[in-house]
Amino acid sequence: MVVDADKKELICSFCSKKQHEVKKLIAGPAVFICDECIDLCTDIMKEESKVALKQITASIPTPQKICKILNDYVVGQDQAKKILAVAVYNHYKRLEYVQSGNNDVELNKSNILLIGPTGSGKTLLAQTLAKILDVPFTMADATSLTEAGYVGEDVENILLRLLISAEFNIAKAQKGIIYIDEVDKIARKSDNPSITRDVSGEGVQQALLKIMEGTVASVPPQGGRKHPQQDFVQLDTSNILFICGGAFMGIDRIIRSRTNHSSIGFAANINIDKEKSNNEILKSLEIEDLTKFGLIPEFIGRLPIITTLDELDKEALITILTKPKNAIVKQYQKQFELDDADLVIDYSALEAIAEKALVKKTGARGLRSILEHLLLDSMYKVAELKKQRVTITKEVVDGLIEPCMTSIISTKLNKKQPIIEDIPA
């Protein structure tokens, strides 16, 4: 306890003002702080928050520039890119507006829901957006979450990951992006309320509501379950952008059922609708379809921006293999170069790889595993042999022959080698 020389009057431990010189003196464990020092600390925190926001908002690209950068990494999905670019741009402009103190019009936060098949680029879009904006980013799997008090992960642990990504800079973390994958897996199990508690479905949706809308959450810095004796980090989620994604397998049937409902008795209309692809059907998505699927209305209400991603076709998968900055074939070619080797893949092989991914219904995500399987033995050998050229053909992909390995005549490996051969004009 800090007192003056006569031990009659308490003083502030920070500015040394006496109790009668300030309005309030708040006691803590062996220390005191006055109201003036509290105000000063508050002003410092606000100023730090403004600086962190200015660093972000000053570098926000326009929606068109965001789309252009996304095109370098993500193939196709033009409409989804446009919607995301506008949504993210408006989100961070909103933060700038709120921070300015101008409150004549209240601007609400607009979280985003991405709906699309596995491997269509949902996660990559979210990751690339965070990279473009240079903000803290974290991903969470909704299937690992449960309600507080049950075995599993609390929703607050998502915020802890964001804090870790921001190196525990609270002001920076409060302007970050959180991507929650597999939200379709936390749909309630049926339309009717059950007497048994759905702790990993509707219960998780309920738990996510507050942090998605905006609240000051108590985050345990060590992770794990909360208990009264531990310290907490207070994190305001009002300005955190939440992007949720999911495949929503079967929602196309719900949409078809709704759109066909008014056509009962008119078989021709039903048959026409059946001929539509899933990509076309998803364009007709309505809020009621998500409710029917198992998302509660309150959860959907926290995700006002909803966009669908198309299933990737063979041409798109081939483009993903070769064209983006982080193209999978380019990555493997670089790995071979590091071993003084060369990798060549002809176009027929790329077609066969894309067709395999389509059959497996794994989208772009399955391309790497297919290539890894094809190149495993070659990567095992070239590390010892060196100066080798590995050629992958359609027959190799089909499992008819082994990859062709030949000695490289020229040892000048810094010369650009073709990634693929025989590309159609």
UniProtKB/Swiss-Prot annotation:
Tell me where in this chain the ClpX-type ZB domain is found.
1-53
Gene Ontology molecular function: ATP binding; ATP hydrolysis activity; ATP-dependent protein folding chaperone; protein dimerization activity; unfolded protein binding; zinc ion binding
Q: Name one GO biological process term.
A: proteolysis involved in protein catabolic process
InterPro entries, alphabetically?
AAA+_ATPase, ATP-dep_Clp_protease_ClpX, ATPase_AAA_core, Clp_ATPase_C, Clp_protease_ATP-bd_su_ClpX, ClpX_bact, P-loop_NTPase, Znf_CppX_C4
Please provide the record's keywords in A-Z order: ATP-binding, Chaperone, Metal-binding, Nucleotide-binding, Zinc
Which Pfam families does this entry report, sorted A to Z? AAA_2, ClpB_D2-small, zf-C4_ClpX
Residue positions binding Zn(2+): 12, 15, 34, 37
This protein's GO CC annotations: HslUV protease complex
Query: Where is ATP annotated to bind?
Result: 117-124
> What does this gene product do?
ATP-dependent specificity component of the Clp protease. It directs the protease to specific substrates. Can perform chaperone functions in the absence of ClpP.
> Subunit structure, per the record?
Component of the ClpX-ClpP complex. Forms a hexameric ring that, in the presence of ATP, binds to fourteen ClpP subunits assembled into a disk-like structure with a central cavity, resembling the structure of eukaryotic proteasomes.
**Would you identify the family this protein belongs to, as annotated?**
Belongs to the ClpX chaperone family.
Q: What is this protein called?
A: ATP-dependent Clp protease ATP-binding subunit ClpX
Q: Which organism is it from?
A: Rickettsia prowazekii (strain Madrid E)
Q: Which gene encodes it?
A: clpX
